Amino acid sequence: DHVTIADLAADILAKSPDRFALVGLSMGGIVAMEMMAQAAERIEKIALFDTNPLVELDEVKQRRQPQLDAVKQGRLRDVMRDEMKPNYLSKGPRREAVLKTCMDMALDLGPEVFIRQSHALMDRVDQTKTLKNIDVPTLILCGRDDTLCPLSRHELMHQLVPHSTLDIIENAGHLPTLEQPETTNESLRKWLKH
């Protein structure tokens, strides 16, 4: 019984206020785009950070299966260490602390959540049409050094969303909220005032 991105989006919408501003990072951005697809009239503004509007590539799906097998065998720590490779993050003084935070979060959530989220990511739908239809203030933000969801994906989203703002965070990879929190928060503040 797999949970889909659509299921996750519907669950969050059911627990959310009638109107709200929405921010999504990485998989959270994928869920945020689906929330926009399901209930655009409820979302006052949207910010998409280090995310991907496209379906998962076959080669990425193929890489996930050995990870899922390893996690089922009790090797979540190994998979996270290998998957979170430091190259997801920019080189910088916060790198080790950010990696530790990510590892702690993964271990706290546990293998079932990793497996559920992996399946949801594998089965996600293309959101380019959703992006073209967005008509609220939109911030698209990414770390310049993000190799998981590269700048080119964010440039595509910026082209698709009319009147969007694209902010590129220097000295940050996939997690600018943790790698460069001050700069990221400044972008968020500007977007919230818009």
Give, region by region, the residue ranges found by the protein language model.
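Active-site loop/oxyanion-hole signature of alpha/beta-hydrolase fold enzymes
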Residues: D1-V23, Q38, E186
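Catalytic active-site module of serine/aspartate enzymes centered on a nucleophile-bearing elbow/loop
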Residues: H163-H194
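Short beta-strand/loop motif that positions the catalytic acidic residue
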Residues: I134, I140-C142, D146
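Flexible "cap/lid" loop of the alpha/beta hydrolase fold
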Residues: I5, A37-D82
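Short alpha-helix in the alpha/beta-hydrolase fold that links the catalytic acid
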Residues: V136, P150-Q159
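Residue in the alpha/beta-hydrolase core beta-strand immediately N-terminal to the catalytic nucleophile
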Residues: A21, E44-A47, K132
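Gly/Ala-rich beta-loop-alpha elbow adjacent to hydrolase catalytic centers
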Residues: G24-G28, A32
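Conserved alpha/beta-hydrolase catalytic His-Asp/Glu region
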Residues: E56-Q62, R75-N133
